[in-house]
């Protein structure tokens, strides 16, 4: 298949691949390990963050262990480039901007806000009649910016719904109430 194939079938494939990228962000931001395994990665996928690929299950376990200590996180994927290798595999480059707030940096308080610019180099595969999923992901870290912040969001006084990184998040509750999966 040519990288520039814009047939109806390929447009559908492109949208399905983009949906997987968006579901990755939602699963990471809500710390939904099950959604990462069910909706994003093939179970035998490999992750490469430092030149030594390892199983996706280890990555998911590390996310589950690390992210509860990060009270605020937001991952946004953009600049998605999809090149089809053949009918059922594609190379996908995307950019991710991740914003994270980390616990107090000093004994005096304050938090650390970090902005990460990351590129993902993904090999997507559609196996059999199954959905598109990531078979291999390489993380390329382009930039990290850290800032100590000496203020925090004021406690809610009404009229505001605050986001959460767990099953009590308002969107998760809305989805579940409609019979949809959390992510």
What is the role of each PLM region?
Residues 28, 41, 96-98, 138-141:
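Short beta-strand segments enriched in hydrophobic/aromatic residues
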Residues 117-159:
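Short beta-strand edge/turn micro-motifs at domain boundaries
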Residues 33-102:
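A solvent-exposed, acidic/Ser-Thr-rich amphipathic alpha-helical stretch
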Residues 1-30, 34, 39:
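Short, low-complexity N-terminal intrinsically disordered segments enriched in polar/charged residues
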Residues 105-112, 151-152:
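Short, surface-exposed loop/helix-turn segments at secondary-structure junctions
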Residues 147-183:
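Acidic/histidine-enriched, glycine/proline-rich intrinsically disordered or flexible terminal extensions
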Residues 4, 21, 63, 95-108, ...:
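Extracellular/periplasmic carbohydrate-active domains that bind, remodel
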Residues 75-77, 115-120:
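Short, surface-exposed coil-to-beta transition loops
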